[in-house]
């Protein structure tokens, strides 16, 4: 049940309760069922007892979907205020507090994220992070572009990023990987993630290299939100194992995006983060290849 709930739009996302009421849905989970629980991050779905459906005919990787639900959930585009909205969309299975929707451009699926708070700085930060990865020569990252979107008469910057899963691969977050793993008392969560990843097909050096790179670049950018759902692995449905690290993604909560006063001097060592450690500076202890 927890896994299923985490695939849905969270109840705490701004505006979701009013949107559910408009759609005549009681919960985000029931909204997700309107699209059979289909997602663009994994291959799980619900087969109704009363219908005979086939994955090839309904999956969002190969089949088109309506923009209507995505427009409603992100306050973008035109919607039917009477609630006659097609809910057959992967927008119902995108979690996180920020408003998001999937769009199709030239047959490619893109995730669009919209945030009207903090002048839309998070979208700009994603682009800055991409330029950093590019300058450092790091290949395994998700490219982000900035797209201006009109909301309530205002132009707001949103981020647009291409799908990095496929018909053959699913995203397994670090949280999903270790949530049922009993971590020994003498092992850190950081080492536990590496250990479980290796047991499920990964090469240890590859995992360490990307985690250390991620920690270092997060430090440079002062990304404060590298929680365990913000990095992960790609799982092969055919090989039934992890095959590579997922590209670096979700770095928008960086560059003091929500600060009125930027820390200086010793204050920089006290920055709190949501990750392996409570303080940003302490994260560097995990970096061995310097």
Task: Name what the model sees in each region.
Residues 227, 232-234:
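Conserved protein-kinase catalytic-loop segment immediately C-terminal to the catalytic Asp
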């Amino acid at each position: 049940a927890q896994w299923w709930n985490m695939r849905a739009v969270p109840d705490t996302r701004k505006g979701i309760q009013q949107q559910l009421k408009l759609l005549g849905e009681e919960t985000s989970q029931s909204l997700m069922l309107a699209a059979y629980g289909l997602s663009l991050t994994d291959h799980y779905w619900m087969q109704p007892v009363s219908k005979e459906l086939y994955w090839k005919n309904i999956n969002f990787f190969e089949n088109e979907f309506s923009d209507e639900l995505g427009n409603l959930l992100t306050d973008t585009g035109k919607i039917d205020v009477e609630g006659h909205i097609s809910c057959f969309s992967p927008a119902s299975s995108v979690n996180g507090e920020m408003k998001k929707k999937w769009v199709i451009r030239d047959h490619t699926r893109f995730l669009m994220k919209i945030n009207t708070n903090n002048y839309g700085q998070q979208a700009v930060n994603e682009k800055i992070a991409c330029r950093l990865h590019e300058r450092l020569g790091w290949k395994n990252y998700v490219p982000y572009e900035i797209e201006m979107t009109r909301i309530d008469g205002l132009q707001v910057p949103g981020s647009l990023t291409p799908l990095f899963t496929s018909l053959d691969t699913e995203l397994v977050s670090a949280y999903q990987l270790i949530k049922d793993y009993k971590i020994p008392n003498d092992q850190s969560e950081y080492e536990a993630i590496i250990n479980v990843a290796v047991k499920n097909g990964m090469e240890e050096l590859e995992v360490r290299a990307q985690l250390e790179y991620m920690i270092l670049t997060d430090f440079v950018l002062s990304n404060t939100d590298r929680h365990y759902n913000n990095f992960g692995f790609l799982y092969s449905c055919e090989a039934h194992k992890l095959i590579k690290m997922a590209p670096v993604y979700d770095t928008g909560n960086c560059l003091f995006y929500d600060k009125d006063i930027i820390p200086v001097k010793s204050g920089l060592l006290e920055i709190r983060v949501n990750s392996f450690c409570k303080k940003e500076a302490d994260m560097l202890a995990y970096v061995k290849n310097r």
